């Protein structure tokens, strides 16, 4: 059985796929916005870009978030 570490979205490389395992901090209103866009526990994501900003795909939508927000989104990579 393979053991994989949970990493923040900010730690992942472009092309990495995984599932959201949790969102760790109060994002002062951003958590509701992320949820409305489909970024919820269990959602599948694919990292598209990590510089200069974090861009990822979730539910067929490309999203860009600040690095601080990306650190708060924990992912179980595939």
Language model features by range: what are they?
Residues 1-78:
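Compact, glycine-rich, soluble single-domain proteins
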């Amino acid at each position: 059985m393979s053991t994989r570490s949970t990493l923040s979205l900010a730690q992942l490389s472009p092309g990495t796929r995984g599932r959201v395992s949790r969102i760790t901090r109060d994002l002062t209103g951003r958590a509701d916005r992320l949820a409305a866009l489909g970024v919820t526990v269990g959602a599948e994501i694919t990292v598209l870009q990590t510089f200069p900003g974090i861009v990822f795909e979730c539910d067929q939508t490309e999203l860009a978030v600040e690095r601080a927000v990306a650190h708060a989104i924990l992912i179980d990579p595939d």
